[in-house]
From Swiss-Prot:
The chain crosses the membrane at residues 184-204. Keywords: Cytoplasmic vesicle, Glycoprotein, Membrane, Phosphoprotein, Signal, Transmembrane, Transmembrane helix. The lineage of its organism: Eukaryota, Metazoa, Chordata, Craniata, Vertebrata. Residues 20-183 are vesicular. This is Equatorin. Residues 117-126 have a biased composition (Basic and acidic residues). Residues 112-131 are annotated as: Disordered.
Amino acid sequence: MDFILLIFLSGVFLPNIFSLQPTVEQDPGVTISDDQYYDEEENNTDENSAIFQKLEDNGGDTPANEKTGNYYKDIKQYVFTTPDSKGTKTEVSVTATTDLKFTMKDYKSSKATASGEEDKRSEPSRKSSTPNVPAFWTMLAKAINETAVSMDDKDLFYQAIPASDLNSTNEDQLSELEEIKLKLMLGISLMTLILLIPLLIFCFATLYKLRHLRDKTCESQYSVNPELATLSYFHPSEGSNQTVLTEESSFLPPEESGKVVIIESNTVNEAEVTEERISE
């Protein structure tokens, strides 16, 4: 990269550098004295002084002569400035020694620097307007007066968070979610009603049946038939009971099968007596 830069700069600035050197057209038969040579060199340097700026000799950077150990005394340093389309200028400094050193500097034009100086001067005037008042009260006063407040980096923590960072969902999406929730609640309530109504009906039916069975048991325990009561009542004045057998018996002979057989007994059950009376 240094070699390419050197070639580029040499192609741009070498014509001007060569103009510094004395150009003498010598005829083959003409000889120039030393005085004329130095006079022409001084004239050339005076003509190019408007383009190039001379700087002080830099003795520390000058190389030494290895044979004699002395430094070169005739050392000159030239600075080249070239403007760019962006409004900046590049500086190239050349030292006229055996070692050529190129240094480039970029800096803005004088207009830009002047505007920068004005901005720097205006900033401390704003800060020094209220040096003794706390920052909170100045901010409060500016907020009341509806003036713009210059916030520092530390004050950015107290600013409100924008709504886009908090929630990225739209109102339409929120309304759709609410509708889904309502539908779920209605579905759950309908399912509970469908399950509870048959359960309640079954409970009422079982209770009614149990009550009806209890009433039947009470009636069967205390019911009295008056006919059976009169028939089952024992009368001692009648004497011994007689049972009449009217049924035909296979054990009797056929001659006596149609007769009535009377069986006398002192002890007869009440059930047999009732049956005989009913048959009469």
